[in-house]
Amino acid sequence: NYGFQNYFNQHTYLRELAEGLFPDNVYERVKRLQEEPRYSFEHMDKRKRSLQQYAEDFRTVYNKAWAKFTGVKPIERAHALALMNSLRPIIDQRLMYFAYYDGKPIGFYLMIPDLNGVIAPLKGHFGAWDKLRFLWRLKVSRKATRIFALIFGVIPEFQGKGIESGMIYNFEQQVNTPHLKRYKSLELAWIGDFNPLMMRMVETLVCAKKHKMHTTYRYLFDREKPFTRAPKMTVKKD
């Protein structure tokens, strides 16, 4: 192996989109959330809220759920809006989920169509005509059949209450509607083994299974220096 050693593994998880895949305890937890009117789950709908408001809801949750981890920085309002604007051409509103408690954002689960099947026929070309073909295949003929999960998060005080399951459950209720029935599976990629909390959440709350694994190797030119694997993600101390 020429001295290269396993620095970290990144897992890709896959989940088929069909009702009845959650274990009973998850359904019971989701049912309790549904019976509490202070909780609400909704997909992006720009008739209800502006893109700017969704960007701010995303920023609010991200900075509470993710920015406390080592190596993760909080994001500013302008950055969050720029991220949403960059996704605008490929957004399917019914794949962008938010959770609220008393109308305040407590979680998000952001997904987009997997573009691999949409882009492949373009054969690497992306001129003006190819862009039109791309949009036609994505928005009109709807060639994407797999969903790619970008990121999800729940603010700390609501973690462990099934909010993640509540969002994906509400999404799955729409899978068989005419707009979404073309989607058959959900992929969650690049989840490192240095983040065991995320792996556990994906396996127990999203109920996805490991599908692929990519390994990053490291070589130390200083052969006297002890090798250590990537440090685990931990919460920053105040």
Which residues fall in each region the model found?
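Acyltransferase donor/substrate-recognition loop-hinge adjacent to the catalytic core
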Residues: 2-70
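Short alpha-helix boundary/capping motifs
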Residues: 27-28, 86-90, 207, 229-231
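Active-site/acyl-donor-binding loops of N-acyltransferases
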Residues: 1, 5-20, 94-97, 101, ...
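A conserved beta-strand-loop-helix scaffold within acyl/acetyltransferase catalytic domains
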Residues: 40-154
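Exposed alpha-helical structural elements
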Residues: 25, 79-82, 197
